[in-house]
């Protein structure tokens, strides 16, 4: 049986077809917004072993035996690491965040000891005479006896296996101390699966009563992703071992303490204009003392204390502030440094500082970071340290973000204290605020700064929000610092990538206000996933980019200089009505009460419902004085009404907030389990705004319609009315309309056009997010000539497929040269595709 083969997705039609197809008009004489030359950058955070065990080239895991050290300011209580008991900056509740902490397992992370013809014990303890005060722990080997030919072997398997290459050289460095060990030491690299030795070096016995550094170069004779490093001891005695490092000489640009070249090249392939570092949630820390302290990331890696970070493992900070700045310089991108604003992550502990002394110290920390990158070594202490590290010239630091994902009035106070001082002293730095571009609190913060909204959502959100920025306030430039389609798309399939492409076209169209963007997260070690989707996957010796990687790459490689008029930027398909379902009541980290609940259906019948008719799905519910009360501090509490189901009705009640951080949740169109449907979030987002949100699999998704400012007071009864129809939902409170939202239209086809001045080319970008071929004609105006031949770059395929180590480019763009263009042409786009057409055009 012969397979039918489609040779090309671009098919040109005769002029009689043109007459029947609605034309998309493009006018090159009508110039739109300039496209920001800095629109595409990268964001690096230590998550999913992006750095340690990833971009940072060190092969030894837990090299300083510090993995078990508690996060700063936390204490060990009954098998858990427990945070300080301090008010949360967002809602003033003492959260005392904690996490399971297996102390003994963490001590030996990455290590194992074998006694072969010997009797020995290995213990990680705080050394009596530490190698360095910043890293007080070491491995103690008590070797009681060794038979002839016997040995004690201390082995590190790296981060799920070391990547070794035949012919490559590896710098070995470790420290040993002993009062009574009189034998030699052998260092060996081998394959943990086969046992094959790929290189070794023998160190003769020497006096090691003081900490003694051992160094050598190991030449690998084999290639494996299952490499390991062993230190072999041949005599009895008590031996202390610390800071064991195996570092490939083949790093990006050959830099000492450098980066894994294949992963660095993947970043270069994105053509980034800037890099954001070091985060992310780890900038905030799970507690304030757990934040990233950039000064502790400088100097000899042996002296860097490291820190357990918010994603569940300890970072060595081998890739520190200096290495970040150096990498930016090496590939010609600007540096964006993110520093703590005096508060920890609000969804963890959320503790914060507020005294003048503490806030002045926060400002000084920003100063010192900027001076390290920019300052004059002759006059500045921190610039001198940069010069001493081998870089007397300034680094390309251009942006500084004050905090990460901080919100609410306390952040406003902090920003208003920090920003004016720094902006006055460093007027050429572009400072970034962490609030979203529509946050009403921006009105309380004067100044010329950027804002940084983030979105992690499902494909529908990104398809439906191509026009998100069309009516965005132009008061502050926008940096979309984190975004990704990460819900319901596996580890990142083509559907996710195509939806992101639609969102990118909207940001590009609005580049007069959206100046910068960066996908997040960047990396994932295949052995640890801390976030649902990540742009680049890798293991010890392989890497590949997801389909989203190629969307980013295509977009960055094919930027126009400026946008030009296009008559149609999107095509709306059918409206998806609000579903028939039950209603529900609830809250988010808030205590509240509901009473006098009644529903009037479309036929005019009104039914009142008692508190005991509600099914309590999440939270702690009880009846108090005839009201249904929710008393817990849980998120997304819910009590539904199984007796009701409908899609056209008016829901009325009285609601009162009695405590907590936000307002009310009213659910409609919900399924029986309370997992899918819609919600009215009243006084949400830290009790600042109200909006409608879809619910998917028990999680709220992004807002439909428009958020409006609203604050809910404590101990006040509100009259609440929600009018629901299949096409529209409207919220009234105390007799006044607050906001409304239409049922979402499924928009899946998009077009964006621009002109590349340097190349003299019209750039047409089209997204087809449907599983059907999309055929359109184009009518090009405003150009003297439009070439018949052009370049087509297209990404398409099965929406559910993903790239993998076995098929790393299963989903990757294909570039072809095609004829049949000109001032009028028609073509068809493949199902589920992102296509860029470049045509020479003279103006």
Spans of model-derived segments:
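Acidic, Ser/Thr/Pro-rich beta/coil linker or hinge segments at domain junctions
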Residues: 785-827
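Catalytic-core region of carbohydrate-active enzymes that cleave or remodel glycosidic bonds
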Residues: 326-327, 419-431, 442, 449-558, ...
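Carbohydrate-binding surface patches
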Residues: 749-786, 792, 835-836
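Extended acidic/polar, glycine-enriched regions
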Residues: 148-269
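Aromatic- and acidic-residue-enriched carbohydrate-binding clefts of CAZyme catalytic domains
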Residues: 42, 73-140, 283-321, 348-364, ...
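Extracellular glycan-recognition regions
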Residues: 571-746
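Extracellular carbohydrate-recognition regions
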Residues: 24-117, 254-280, 565-623
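Extra-cytoplasmic beta-strand recognition segments
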Residues: 61-68, 103, 155-185, 212-219, ...
């Amino acid at each position: 049986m012969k397979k039918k083969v489609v040779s090309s997705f671009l098919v040109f039609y005769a002029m009689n077809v043109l007459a029947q197809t609605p034309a998309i008009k493009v006018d090159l004489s009508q110039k739109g917004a300039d496209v920001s030359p800095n629109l595409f950058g990268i964001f690096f955070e230590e998550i999913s072993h992006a750095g340690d065990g990833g971009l940072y080239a060190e092969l030894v895991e837990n090299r300083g035996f510090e993995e078990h050290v508690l996060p700063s300011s936390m204490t060990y209580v009954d098998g858990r690491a427990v945070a300080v008991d301090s008010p949360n900056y967002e809602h003033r509740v003492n959260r005392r965040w904690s996490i399971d902490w297996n102390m003994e397992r963490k001590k030996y992370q990455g290590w194992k000891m074998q006694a072969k013809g010997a009797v020995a014990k290995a213990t990680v303890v705080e050394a009596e005479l530490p190698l360095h005060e910043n890293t007080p722990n070491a491995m103690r080997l008590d070797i009681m006896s060794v038979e002839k030919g016997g040995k004690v072997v201390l082995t590190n398997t790296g981060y799920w296996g070391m990547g070794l290459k035949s012919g490559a050289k590896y710098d070995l460095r470790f420290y040993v101390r002993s009062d009574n060990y009189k034998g030699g030491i052998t260092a060996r690299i081998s394959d943990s699966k086969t046992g094959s030795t790929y290189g070794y070096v023998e160190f003769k016995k020497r006096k090691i009563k003081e900490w003694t550094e051992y160094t050598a170069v190991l030449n690998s004779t084999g290639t494996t992703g299952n490499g390991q490093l062993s230190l072999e001891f041949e005599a009895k005695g008590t031996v202390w071992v610390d800071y064991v490092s195996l570092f490939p000489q083949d790093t990006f640009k050959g830099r000492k303490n450098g980066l894994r070249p294949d992963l660095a090249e993947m970043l270069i392939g994105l053509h980034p204009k800037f890099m954001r570092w070091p985060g992310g949630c780890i900038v905030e820390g799970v507690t304030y003392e757990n934040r990233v302290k950039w000064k502790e990331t400088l100097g000899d890696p042996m002296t860097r204390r490291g820190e357990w970070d918010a994603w569940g493992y300890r970072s060595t900070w081998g890739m520190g502030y200096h290495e970040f700045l150096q990498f930016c310089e090496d590939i010609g991108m600007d540096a964006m440094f993110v520093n703590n604003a005096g508060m920890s992550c609000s969804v963890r502990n959320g503790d914060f500082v507020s005294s003048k002394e503490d806030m002045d110290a926060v400002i000084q920390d920003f100063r010192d970071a900027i001076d390290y990158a920019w300052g004059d070594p002759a006059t500045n202490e921190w610039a001198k340290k940069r010069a001493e590290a081998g870089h007397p010239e300034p680094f390309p630091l251009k942006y500084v973000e004050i905090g990460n994902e901080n919100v609410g009035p306390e952040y406003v106070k902090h920003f208003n204290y920090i920003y004016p001082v720094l902006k006055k002293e460093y007027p050429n730095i572009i400072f970034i605020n962490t609030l979203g571009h529509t946050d009403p609190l921006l009105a309380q913060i004067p100044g010329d700064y950027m804002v940084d909204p983030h979105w992690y959502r499902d494909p529908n959100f990104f398809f439906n929000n191509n026009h998100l920025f069309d009516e965005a306030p132009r008061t502050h430039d926008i940096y979309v610092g984190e975004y990704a389609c990460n819900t319901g798309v596996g580890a990142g399939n083509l559907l996710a990538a195509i939806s992101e492409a639609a969102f990118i076209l909207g940001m590009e169209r609005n580049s007069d206000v959206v100046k910068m963007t960066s996908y997040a997260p960047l990396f994932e070690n295949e052995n640890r996933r801390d976030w649902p989707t990540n742009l680049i996957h890798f293991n010890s010796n392989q890497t590949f980019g997801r389909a989203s990687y190629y969307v980013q790459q295509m977009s960055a490689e094919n930027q126009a200089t400026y946008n030009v008029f296009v008559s149609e930027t999107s095509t709306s398909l059918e409206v998806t009505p609000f579903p028939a379902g039950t209603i529900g009541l609830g809250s988010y980290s808030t205590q509240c009460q509901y009473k006098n609940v009644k529903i009037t259906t479309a036929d005019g019948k009104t039914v009142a419902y008692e508190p005991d008719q509600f099914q309590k799905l999440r939270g702690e519910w009880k009846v108090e004085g005839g009201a249904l009360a929710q008393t817990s501090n849980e998120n997304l509490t819910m009590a539904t009404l199984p007796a009701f189901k409908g899609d056209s009705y008016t829901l009325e009640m009285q609601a009162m907030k009695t405590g907590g951080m936000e307002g009310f949740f009213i659910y409609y169109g919900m399924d029986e389990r309370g997992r899918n449907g819609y919600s009215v979030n009243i006084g949400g987002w830290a009790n600042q705004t109200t909006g409608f949100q879809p619910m998917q699999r028990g999680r709220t998704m992004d807002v439909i319609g428009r958020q409006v400012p609203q604050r809910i007071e404590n101990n006040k009864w509100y009259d609440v009315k929600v009018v629901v129809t299949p096409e529209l939902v409207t919220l009234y409170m105390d007799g006044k309309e607050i906001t409304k939202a239409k049922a979402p239209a499924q928009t899946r086809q998009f077009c964006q056009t621009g002109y590349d001045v340097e190349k003299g080319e019209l750039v047409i970008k089209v997204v087809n997010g449907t599983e059907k071929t999309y055929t359109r004609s184009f009518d090009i105006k405003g150009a003297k000539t439009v070439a018949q031949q052009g370049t087509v770059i297209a990404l398409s395929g099965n929406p559910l497929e993903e790239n993998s180590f076995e098929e790393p480019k299963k989903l990757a763009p294909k570039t072809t040269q095609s004829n049949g263009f000109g001032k009028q042409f028609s073509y068809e786009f493949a199902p589920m595709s992102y296509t860029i057409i470049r045509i020479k055009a003279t103006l």
